[in-house]
Amino acid sequence: MLEADLFFNYLSVERRFSKHTIVGYQTDLLQFSNFIKDTYEVEDIREVSHLYIRSWVVSLMENGIDPKSVNRKITALRSFYKFLIKTGVVDKNPMLKIQAPKISKKLPEFLDDKKMDALFDNMSNDGNVYEQARDFLILDFFYRTGVRLSELIELKIENVNLHNLSVTVTGKRNKVRQIPITIGFKQAIEKYLKLRKEFLNNLSMNCHYFFTDNKGNKMYPVFVYRIVKANIKMVTTGKKKSPHILRHTFATTMLNNGADINAIKELLGHSNLSATQVYTHNTIEKLKEVYKQAFPKA
């Protein structure tokens, strides 16, 4: 579909969407295209009505797709039709009659201080083994900076400024932000960099990325996910064991220790404050616990 190719190019060049997001949009639009073709024998995007789209949404829900995933697919299709209107391919937008299913708000899961202490106590970082130092620093990096998985993978050596005690991160839509680090964290990074240099020299490798896999190459998402999951599962029975739980932990820890929510928003790279405000719910729950301890008979 020519229109789709132009749309994906538009997302990449003008909107600066990440490759991960574009691949997701491609998958969602292909799924929709196959649905209307198989169900209604429609291949021309100009012939699609809002009734076809509603039917697709219903089929997704009936097949057990969770509302959050359905909303993502609707967002992809909504963006596509906005593009088609903008480029004059269609003159009516059927998405205007489509409502996204409501999502029950869930508080972000995080690890409390005791679990974080146990997490790092369980990990070995005393020796001179590169892989151990790397794995330890990966989890520590997520926890101390709140970066996303994709941001950590794309981090390069020059992005970590130990002189100025800051990390430069390129986030969604190529938005650049700086995250401060402590002197204590600087020392952990220096130890890692020393082992990293020896490790790459032994492999005769020259990798510009800050973290590498076991072969000295750029890491990939599943590689990092496995490292994080393997260690987090040692301290929690919760369902969430992904790198994102450490991002949630970073934000919650900052807020619980008095950080301004607008500052947390900037550190996380959120575009809107509403995305950051979800962490205030966790703080309220903590305040309730403190209150009960102070006034047990209240």
Region roles according to the model:
Residues 1-298:
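Conserved catalytic core of the tyrosine transesterase superfamily
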